[in-house]
From Swiss-Prot:
Its cofactor is Mg(2+); Mn(2+). Belongs to the SELO family. The active site is at residue 248. The keyword Translocase does not apply. GO terms for molecular function: AMPylase activity; ATP binding; magnesium ion binding. Nucleotidyltransferase involved in the post-translational modification of proteins. It can catalyze the addition of adenosine monophosphate (AMP) or uridine monophosphate (UMP) to a protein, resulting in modifications known as AMPylation and UMPylation. This is Protein nucleotidyltransferase YdiU.
Length: 480
């Protein structure tokens, strides 16, 4: 089957990009590709044949129909207007046309210098491409909206970061790479007609049912806000901290995008900061819902030329509603509740307080709770708490709450085990794969990808364990 590509972004939004070609790496070689995703997209296996070199995965060739561009956008970074940004190391190669008429961006990260590289070198390093490939696939299999990773290419090109590292490229796929920052770019350049063109593009291609509706812009922004709310709720329920929620890292489609200094909670710490450059804790775990709203407010400002203030405020209210509703639903599922009752939040917050005092592992606590039987006086979960009396008091209230529902243990446990993962991408697991890959051993990278495809399967190995001492509180930076 021949892959078909279109260039809607290039054809319809000429002010938003610079056309250019990727700059290949030295001795580039394919070290990993996403076989399952490739099969779903009917990508010919021959394209992954190592005897053909790095090919399109390393920017050495283009496929018919590809029209590569680097996109320009702006944004607020750490709450401060940063001005023009853009694809400083990435190139949108083209948009794959799928059988249902939708498209999928092929975006090559680490593809070389662009007009938007600023002081950078246009490159990505092996460490960061491995982290993004693992994180995006982990999030996908957790059921969280995200970009996807299709391939990683390593090379002999040296790249200087804090130390000298190895240049690499990642092929990232997404329904769209449209960001809040695209709208900010033209708003602050005082070009409102181009802001409206971006909105028209989004509605035409992603919400076509509203094209001929009088209130199409208000409806569209309301949906952007709701998607963002549901996304943040998903992050909070799995203990995911993005690390760098700048407005240029926010997706119009409500996707998790731009994996940098992210981290999944080990010990439950609501103030967890994944990014060691975030000295003020702006992007700490428990502040993500507030930051997302702040970012939506910045986006709303750009839409004031063609959406009424009241409609914008209604959309922002929709964010809060979507966030709280979705978060509540997810957390009740994690606790094994099939109905909503007025004291559920209090019971959840009591558990969180107990976990915070004890330094309980976030993922393991909920997974172990999903195996606990109502009638059990003792359990492996109880044994993880030092203050057994406090746990017993909470568990008695929890057990009483479960008894209000006509659901047996087996059905409850089944539901809980579908939403409480046994495995998440802890930073130490990613680092172990990176360390091996930097020595030329890709086995752990491939093995970890396979493990992350089954996050709700119980394991008795270290993929589901608490981190070792060296793996606790690993510092992660924005450097990529």
């Amino acid at each position: 089957m021949t892959l078909s590509f279109t260039a809607r972004w290039r054809d319809e939004l000429p002010a938003t990009y610079t056309a250019l070609l990727p700059t290949p790496l030295k001795n580039a070689r394919l070290i990993w590709y996403n076989d399952k995703l490739a099969q779903q997209l009917a990508i010919p296996a021959s394209l992954f044949d190592a005897t053909n070199g790095a090919g399109v995965w390393g920017g050495e060739t283009l496929l018919p129909g590809m029209s590569p561009v680097a996109q320009v956008y702006s944004g607020h970074q750490f709450g401060v207007w940063a001005g023009q940004l853009g694809d400083g190391r990435g190139i949108l190669l083209g948009e794959q046309l799928l059988a249902d008429g939708s498209t999928l961006d092929w975006h090559l990260k680490g593809a070389g210098l662009t007009p938007y590289s600023r002081m950078g070198d246009g490159r990505a390093v092996l460490r960061s491409t491995i982290r993004e490939s693992l994180a995006s696939e982990a999030m996908h299999y957790l059921g969280i909206p995200t970009t996807r990773a299709l391939s990683i290419v390593a090379s002999d090109t040296p790249v200087q970061r804090e130390t000298q590292e190895t240049g690499a490229m990642l092929m990232r796929l997404a329904q769209s790479h449209m960001r809040f920052g695209h709208f900010e770019h033209f708003y602050y350049r005082r070009e409102p007609e181009k802001v409206q063109q971006l909105a028209d593009f989004a509605i035409r291609h992603y919400w076509p049912q509203w094209q001929d509706v009088a209130e199409k812009y208000a409806l569209w922004f309301e949906e952007v806000a709701a998607r963002t709310g549901r996304l943040i709720a998903e992050w909070q329920t799995v203990g995911f901290a993005h690390g760098v929620m700048n407005t240029d890292n926010m997706s119009i489609l409500g996707l998790t995008i731009d994996y940098g200094p992210f981290g999944f909670l080990d010990d439950y710490d609501p103030g967890f900061i994944g990014n060691h450059s975030d000295h003020q804790g702006r992007y700490r775990f428990d502040n993500q819902p507030s930051v997302a709203l702040w970012n939506l407010q910045r986006l709303a400002q750009t839409l004031t030329p063609f959406i009424e203030i009241d409609a914008l405020n209604r959309a922002l209210d929709r964010y809060q509603d979507a966030l709280l509703t979705h978060y509540g639903q997810r957390m009740r599922q994690k606790l094994g509740f099939f109905t909503e009752q007025k004291d559920d939040n209090a019971l959840l917050n009591e558990l969180f307080s107990l976990m915070a005092r004890e330094g309980s592992d976030y993922t393991r606590t909920f997974r172990m709770l999903s195996h606990t039987e109502q009638q059990s006086a003792s359990s492996p979960l109880r044994d993880t708490f030092i203050d057994r009396a406090a746990f017993d008091a909470w568990f008695d209230r929890y057990r009483a709450r479960l008894r209000t529902e006509a659901v047996d243990d087996a059905l409850r446990q089944q539901q809980m085990q579908r939403v409480n993962p046994a495995v998440v991408l802890r930073n130490w697991l990613a680092q172990r794969a990176i360390d091996a890959a930097e020595q030329g051993d890709m086995a752990e990278l491939h093995r970890l990808h396979e493990v992350l495809r089954q996050p709700f399967t119980d394991r008795d190995d270290d993929y589901a364990s608490r981190p070792p001492e060296w793996g606790k509180r690993l510092e992660v930076s924005c450097s990529s």
